[in-house]
Regions:
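Bacterial N-terminal signal peptides that target proteins for export
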Residues: 1-11
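Short helix-capping/linker turns of helical repeat alpha-solenoids
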Residues: 27, 39-44, 57-60, 73-75, ...
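Cleaved targeting-peptide boundary
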Residues: 23-32
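Hydrophobic face of amphipathic alpha-helices that form TPR/SEL1-like repeat modules
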Residues: 31-39, 51-55, 66-73, 102-109, ...
């Protein structure tokens, strides 16, 4: 699954940058990293790439994720999925949750690497177990579809719930849908309506539609 740029940016800033101040950087590399962030805010991705490259080469996982994102989306550098995978892998192997999510997506889609659902699930799971909501959603979806794992509606619901409780709108919709259909959980229209409402409030249009139908007694 290719995530919108805004989603990977959110994942990076929400998880990778959480460790920013604890990283053992001297003043100059830290300033260099910050200058890269400021460059992206101006739309100057080439400058950001040049600033982050030496940090990534020195083994900084956050910079590695950002380089992977740059290569994946052609931001300041020629688009190259193989290079994106290389940098995501380096960060993922250091335990970066955003990188694990992205590496899983590259395996699921077969971009820059041979398509492999089992390998995708491996990386989604590592990110999900660190509490990354988008990875928890993805794990729920692969259990729902039986991609790389044995199809299991109960496991799908378990992961939807974890992501939903962290505020992921699509997971909230999927959890509501599971309650509506009784997939992996007992039918409960009241709870379905509750989760559809939360999804709607978080911008998931399908949640609004289903909430309205339940409210009008059409389902």
């Amino acid at each position: 699954m290719k995530f919108p740029k805004t989603l990977i940016t959110t994942a990076i800033l929400g998880f990778s940058l959480a460790s920013f101040h604890s990283t053992a950087w001297a003043g100059t590399p830290e300033q260099q990293f910050q200058q890269g962030l400021e460059a992206t805010e101006r739309g100057d991705y080439q400058t950001a790439f040049k600033l982050w490259l030496p940090l990534a080469e020195q083994g900084d996982a956050i910079a590695q994720v950002l380089l992977g994102n740059a290569y994946e989306n052609g931001l300041g550098v020629k688009q190259d999925d193989v290079e994106a995978v290389k940098w995501y892998r380096q960060a993922a192997e250091q335990g970066d949750a955003a990188a694990q999510l992205k590496l899983g997506a590259m395996y699921e889609d077969g971009r820059g690497v041979k398509q492999d659902d089992v390998e995708a699930v491996k990386w989604y799971r590592q990110a999900a177990e660190q509490g990354l909501a988008l990875a928890q959603l993805q794990l729920g979806l692969v259990y729902n579809k039986g991609l790389g794992v044995k199809q299991d509606d109960v496991e799908a619901v378990r992961w939807y719930r974890q992501a939903a409780e962290r505020g992921d709108a699509q997971a909230q919709f999927m959890l509501g849908f599971s309650y509506l259909l009784g997939k992996g959980i007992q039918v409960n229209k009241s709870l379905a309506k509750e989760w559809f409402g939360k999804a709607c409030n978080n911008g998931e249009q399908r949640g609004c539609e289903y909430y309205g139908k339940l409210n009008r007694g059409e389902m």
